[in-house]
Each structure stands twice: as structure tokens, then as C-alpha cells.
A protein has these predicted regions:
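Thiamine diphosphate
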Residues: 1-300
Length: 300
């Protein structure tokens, strides 16, 4: 945000009393007040009101680009505002951080599980979960340029590595190949967000040709032509494994009837983020084991 704030002087917004945690404050931007000065809005601890205010600003005259931010878990509190934004085709932007069990010790009350599927179920909402800093740049680009509906960004709390082959521009296509074997792929790993790094590490350890697909936005991928979708996910490759730290609901659209999902079908746990992720199977070793078992089953 600091990098592009000078180029987006009409962008205003803030957080539901979590600006320091979500990192969504324009430094030096001042606080919006009765004099209408400042770009930072102090919404207070009231997520639904924040969403409604963001929608109202978006409705005003189209001159301002409003955003509201909180933890992803608290998107439940503002769901109706998000739905109205989608229904009304507003240019509202929602920035949700702390997007998985990887957030750590705050535990199940703060760890999103069903939220990816729930938010993807809202028609006309772009839900983007970038893998690293490069994809986050691309996600912001989509968010600032998209018309005809709201955009939601789901970002991690934990640090993630900058990956070698991620692309800012490719985010606009919803999904793309970040790793391909020398030979035709026999297994495809499909991941979103911080789990893309796990998929890439697993692919390095696989003894069969394995493709890795980053899928930051289902909705944008669905809007691509069938030729591109089949190029990314060849129909003849049935051994497809999704890797996402949430429920598997909806993933069979992409992994197919014979594919499998590494998912979380229960509430989280209070422990350091890496410990929770390892406990729930988000390790390269587990991905390799699941992928090889899937390939064997599909091939038999």
C-alpha cells in the first residue's frame, strides 16, 4: 500500500480497530474526521458497519476507492455487507488477513476453516488468496482495476517465502503453472496462498513428473476460455491433488471425480502456526505421500 498510495490519491479506508495487525494504514495519510481530512478511516470494532460504510462510499459517485480490513475470521460479521456489495456490483475492496490456521496461538476462534468456501459461494465476489509477495502485487492490481463487483484479498499472518516462478500478471487469469516437469505431468498439485510453497517443495521430492498450479482466484480462472483452463489442467491428467488450509467443499470442480484434497474438515488448534500446519498435514512429506497414493489409485 505504501508503494502505490501516491498513485491512488482517491483510495480511502481503514480497519475495524486492527490496522496495526492488518498493515492497512496509509502512513502519514491522516485520519478522516469532521473536516473530511485524511485517508485513514477509524471504523471501530464493528465489522458490519465498516462493510456498510465502504459500500456507501463506493455508491457515492465512483470517485473514491474504499477498502475495509479485518481478520478473515471476522468476515462473518460483515457478510451481509459483502453480499450487498456483490449484488449491487460495487467497487468495494475487503482486505482480510490472518487467513489460516497458520496464524497460530489465537486458536480455533480466530482460525478460518469454512470461510474460503463460504466466501467463494457469493456470486460476483472475487476472492483472491495470493501465494507470496509477487502474487500479492498482482492481487492488488486486480483489486484496483476490477469493475462490476467487489474484490476480497485473503492474506497470511505468517511470513512466506518469495517463490521463484510466481507471476503478478498471471493472477488476473486466476490460475497458472508455477512448476512443470521435463516430461508430461502425471500428477498435478493445485494450491492457493501459503500452501503453494508446500506444493512446490513436494514437487521437488516427487519421483514422477509433477506439475504445480497456483490458483489464487477461482472466479477469475472460471472466466478464462476452456482452451486456457485445459492448458493449465489437462483433462487427461486425473491424478490431481488440491492443497488448501480449509474445507474441501467445492474443490472437486478442479480436481475432478478421481482427484483428492488435502483439507481441514474440523476446527483448528491453539499452537504455533508451523506446529498446527504440520499436525494437519501441510508438509511436503505428507503431500508427496498423498500424491503418490493418488497416482497409484488413479492408474490402477
Amino acid at each position: 500500500m505504501e508503494a502505490f498510495k501516491r498513485y491512488t490519491p482517491t483510495m480511502v479506508g481503514g480497519a475495524a480497530d486492527l490496522a496495526e495487525s492488518t498493515k492497512t494504514e496509509f502512513k502519514g495519510g491522516g485520519v478522516f474526521s469532521a473536516t473530511h481530512a485524511g485517508r485513514n478511516i477509524a471504523f471501530g470494532i464493528r465489522e458490519f458497519a465498516m462493510g456498510a460504510i465502504v459500500n456507501g462510499i463506493s455508491l457515492h459517485d465512483g470517485m473514491l476507492k474504499p477498502y475495509g480490513s479485518t481478520f478473515l475470521i471476522f468476515s462473518d460479521y460483515m457478510r451481509n455487507a459483502v453480499r450487498i456489495a456483490a449484488l449491487s456490483e460495487l467497487q468495494s475492496l475487503f482486505v482480510w488477513t490472518h487467513d489460516s490456521v497458520g496464524l497460530g496461538e489465537d486458536g480455533p476462534t480466530h482460525q478460518p476453516i469454512e470461510h474460503y468456501a463460504s466466501l467463494r459461494a457469493i456470486p460476483n465476489l472475487l476472492f483472491i488468496r495470493p501465494a507470496d509477495g509477487t502474487e500479492t502485487v498482482g492481487a492488488w492490481k486486480v483489486a484496483l482495476q476490477h469493475e462490476g463487483g467487489p474484490v476480497a484479498l485473503a492474506l497470511t499472518r505468517q511470513k512466506v517465502p518469495t517463490l521463484e516462478r510466481t507471476s503478478a500478471d498471471a493472477v488476473a487469469r486466476g490460475a497458472y503453472v508455477v512448476h512443470d516437469p521435463d516430461d508430461a505431468p502425471e500428477v498435478i498439485l493445485i494450491a492457493t496462498g501459503s500452501e503453494v510453497a508446500v506444493a512446490l517443495e513436494a514437487a521437488k521430492r516427487m519421483d514422477v513428473p509433477t506439475r504445480v498450479v497456483s490458483m489464487p482466484c477461482w472466479e477469475l480462472f472460471e472466466r478464462q476460455g476452456s482452451d486456457y483452463r485445459d492448458e493449465v489442467l489437462p483433462p487427461d491428467v486425473k491424478a490431481r491433488l488440491s492443497i488448501e488450509a480449509g474445507v474441501a467443499l467445492g474443490w472437486h470442480k478442479w480436481v475432478g471425480d478421481e482427484g483428492d484434497c488435502i483439507s481441514i474438515e474440523h476446527f483448528g488448534a491453539s499452537a504455533p502456526g508451523p506446529t498446527v500446519l504440520e499436525k494437519f498435514g501441510y508438509t511436503a512429506d505428507n503431500v508427496v505421500a498423498r500424491a503418490l497414493a493418488l497416482r497409484e489409485r488413479v492408474s490402477s
